[in-house]
Amino acid sequence: MSLQAPKGTKDLLPTESYKWQYLENKFRNIAADFGCREIRTPVFEYTELFQRGVGETTDVVQKEMYTFEDKAGRSITLKPEGTSPAVRAFVEGRLFNETQPTKMYYFTPVMRYENVQKGRLRQHHQFGIEIFGAKDASVDAEVISIPVGIYKELGVEGVELNINSIGCPKCRKTYNEALKKYLSKNYDKLCSTCKTRFDKNPLRILDCKVDTCKEIVKDAPIILDYICDECKDHFESLKSYLDVLDIKYKVDPFIVRGLDYYSKTVFEFIIDDITICAGGRYDYLIEEIGGPSMPAVGFGMGIERLLLTLQEKAIEIPEEAYVDLYLGNMGDKAKLEVLKLAKELRDRHIKCEIDHMGKSVKAQMKYANRIGAKYSMVLGEEELNTGKVSLKRMEDGKQIEVDIKEIDTLIKVFK
């Protein structure tokens, strides 16, 4: 029996990788426009990082993490999200001693044991941005504007931005009391997980995916009615900044996000009732992980989910030709010359492909056409004797005669 990729994973084949490269290049350029620099963190971390950062009572920690003991008996977890590792690296690298804010972006695989379905894999990839050291709501608005710009540049329409504030630990305590009072009336109907959350972290019940719990929380108290004046001012400022940036939004008081580290601002980008990007502020996570008290805000965007959206919206990603020139040959002597010419061109960053299979000239030209080469030429005995060769533009068949030895002249055709 042939081996297959594990359930919930997907190979990225060369026929699809150009789409990822296109998006990654676009994301890098946009991140650079905002002054962000790249960070790369390990694919696995100590489990405690996610227990402390993401939260013991979250679905991610309780149900979805890939956790194991290494040979030394240490508990290790494959990265289920990108923010906690970025914060850990920020603290461990003592970047808090540098001039703030610190702006980072990353591409990372994340692993969660979830039910596999359309657009949801057990290993998927995220593009994320994290900004440390700035507490003003203008930073929240700036972070939110990045996905807005991405969707606009890609031509994705129909994306809705939902925002909320879940307050700070001080005002959340008051809200939790009101929420527990409301939930106590239907305590017996809560799922077993939410019964555990009732005392430990009732806010998590608002994020439960079980139908009975979703029905119960429909009429729950709204957290915006309980946030303190400071959090209220921050949220009002955020809305003002979004208005100035002409970013349309809707306030959804039931967004809480599935991770415990969030405070104040939380947001989601929705299309066709599916979340395609989400984030928020996490002003207490850096201190929780061992750093100083320092504000932070960021987001994560699933790349597979974005690609699926582009496909559903019939938005095509342009495929660049990966071969500039196909160099055909007839005979061993010509093959030697082709090898030498290909090396000279590759040294000048011209993408070349040559025949290694001993194909006929007709088969070589078919291959050149199939791989999408921009140009082709064939060297044989006559071309070697005259030093001249016909360079064919594959798009329309137009040919020009070039001198084999005039590399600079040949280069100009491709530049």
From Swiss-Prot:
Annotated compartments: Cytoplasm
PANTHER family: HISTIDINE--TRNA LIGASE, MITOCHONDRIAL-RELATED, HISTIDYL-TRNA SYNTHETASE
GO molecular function list: ATP binding; catalytic activity, acting on a protein; histidine-tRNA ligase activity; transferase activity
Disulfide links within the chain: none
Coarse class of the protein's main subcellular location: cytoplasm
UniProt KW keywords: Aminoacyl-tRNA synthetase, ATP-binding, Cytoplasm, Ligase, Nucleotide-binding, Protein biosynthesis
Family: Belongs to the class-II aminoacyl-tRNA synthetase family.
Annotated EC: 6.1.1.21
Protein name: Histidine--tRNA ligase
Superkingdom as given in the UniProt entry: Bacteria
CDD domains per the UniProt record, alphabetical: HisRS-like_core (cd00773), HisRS_anticodon (cd00859)
GO terms of biological process kind: histidyl-tRNA aminoacylation
Keyword Secreted: no
InterPro entries registered for this protein in UniProt: aa-tRNA-synth_II (IPR006195), aa-tRNA-synth_II/BPL/LPL (IPR045864), Anticodon-bd (IPR004154), Anticodon-bd_dom_sf (IPR036621), His-tRNA-ligase (IPR015807), HisRS-like_core (IPR041715), HisRS/HisZ (IPR004516), HisRS_anticodon (IPR033656)
Keyword Ligase attached: yes
EC class name: ligase
GO cellular component terms, A-Z: cytoplasm
Reaction equation(s) it catalyzes: tRNA(His) + L-histidine + ATP = L-histidyl-tRNA(His) + AMP + diphosphate + H(+)
Quaternary organization: Homodimer.
